[in-house]
Amino acid sequence: LVFSYAEIIGLDVKLWRDSVGAPLNIQPVIERLMPKDKTKPPVNYDLRINNIVVRRSRLSYDVKSKAEADRRFDRNHVEITDLKADILLPRIKNDDYVIDVKRLALKERSGLEIESFGGVFSASTSRLSVSGLRLEMPSSLLEFADMEVTYDGWRELADNMFNLPADVKLLDGSHIATSDLACFVPVFAGMNRRVDVSFDMSGPLSDVRVRNITAATYEGDMRLSLSGRVSGLPDVGN
């Protein structure tokens, strides 16, 4: 089944839950979409959409029992406006998915602004890959080398996600501006420092080998270079 074009204009999605862990307000809809008889094999499908365009859309999420944080990003109260996207779905079929995000842009009430996010995401029963991953903010740019994770079936991916090895590399030319991070670190508000960054890491998340992390200010008054190993990341905070 092939669709040439789909357009979504003025979408306004409001998600909420009464407290952390409580069901979402759309839980009845989710339950209706779930198969009634889980012993039946899944229905075969093969879908392609050549272009999905999203413009002037909004998305909000609220945990009603939580107070709102001032002047910073709050994961319990997210309000996205001016959502734009250009997405291709070259292949959506049983156990084989390809999503090509040409551009996704948005603004969040905390001041977070993403001018462009894109990449090609592929998943099958044996391989998960990301290519051309790129994030642009008003004064920041992050570009990643292609990434790939291999596994033996969806069950292994779900059960051993933190134990699957991968290489993650942030390419030279990437940089972060403090002004773009003020929504996470309020003290950065009013500051405008650029830091050139790159890193090269490998291994499972539970035992990361850091070949190199480099950070240097654009003005040249600070440079930091690190290497080493980090273990136990999935358990941090437990």
Where are the language model's segments positioned?
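Secondary-structure transition motifs
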Residues: 1-95, 112-114, 140, 144-151, ...
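Transmembrane beta-barrel domains of outer membrane proteins
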Residues: 46, 122, 200-202, 227-231
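Transmembrane beta-strand segments that form the barrel wall of outer-membrane beta-barrel proteins
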Residues: 100-104, 128-135, 207-215
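Short sequence motifs at beta-strands and strand-loop junctions characteristic
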Residues: 111, 189-193
